[in-house]
């Protein structure tokens, strides 16, 4: 599923919750570079490098709601690594706490044909979701509020091919998955009590979606009325 590119290429850039540092996830050389944000000089200063396992393919970093933990998704090793984060000292400190698989038990030993692809933190800060291409699934993890550690609750199919990204709705009850190879977006309701997802509607056609985001609509927003066939011909 994933073709390895050994050249440096940053896949995700995200500031730490305290806005002191910028984390650049380099999928090509298996590193997460940490830069200090020098606001006075308007520069970035490299202060640390998280050297990940060789050919693990770090792809995305997300931070817990309280800012104490970092979650890094690894595309090639199909896992999420949990790190503690402390930015109170002179330099940032990251400590590896846990590694969990993104794969179902059926494919747990078949990492070569799968690729972890999307990672999203639920608005309630209590759950983490990820997608895995190849087996085409979404997994949900419960976050321990005290330790930041993850407990997998389910890994289920998403009725699409190559789920490259996902987003959780603000109501915390629904997710949408962008399926790159099947040209669709699929939406689901999350049943936290029974640890399942239920598809809301038929897949929505979108050409080769790569990323999916959700933005609040302003109250004064006015939807543009689609042109009729006759009006379209006149344009």
Spell out what each predicted region is.
Residues 1-2, 45-50, 92-103, 150-157, ...:
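Beta-propeller fold detector
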Residues 180-189, 198-234:
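Blade-level signature of beta-propeller repeat domains, shared across WD40, Kelch, NHL, RCC1
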């Amino acid at each position: 599923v994933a073709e390895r590119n050994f050249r440096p290429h940053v896949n995700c850039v995200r500031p730490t919750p305290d806005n002191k540092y910028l984390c650049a996830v380099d999928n090509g050389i298996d590193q997460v570079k940490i830069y200090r944000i020098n606001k006075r000089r308007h520069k970035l200063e490299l202060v640390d490098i998280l050297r990940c396992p060789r050919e693990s393919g770090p792809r995305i970093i997300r931070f817990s709601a309280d800012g104490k933990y970092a979650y890094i998704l690894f595309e090639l090793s199909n896992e999420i690594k949990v790190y503690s984060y402390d930015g109170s000292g002179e330099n940032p400190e990251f400590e590896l706490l846990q590694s969990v698989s993104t794969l179902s038990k059926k494919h747990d030993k078949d990492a070569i044909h799968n690729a972890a692809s999307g990672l999203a933190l639920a608005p309630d800060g209590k759950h983490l979701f990820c997608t895995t291409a190849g087996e085409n699934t979404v997994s949900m993890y419960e976050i321990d509020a005290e330790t930041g550690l993850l407990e997998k609750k389910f890994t289920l199919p998403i009725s699409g091919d190559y789920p490259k990204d996902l987003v959780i709705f603000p109501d915390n009850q629904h997710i949408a998955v962008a399926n790159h190879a099947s040209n669709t977006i699929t939406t689901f309701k999350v049943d936290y009590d029974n640890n399942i997802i239920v598809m809301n509607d038929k897949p929505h056609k979108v050409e080769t979606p790569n990323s999916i985001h959700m933005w609040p609509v302003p109250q004064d927003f006015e939807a543009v009325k689609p042109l009729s066939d006759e009006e379209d011909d006149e344009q």
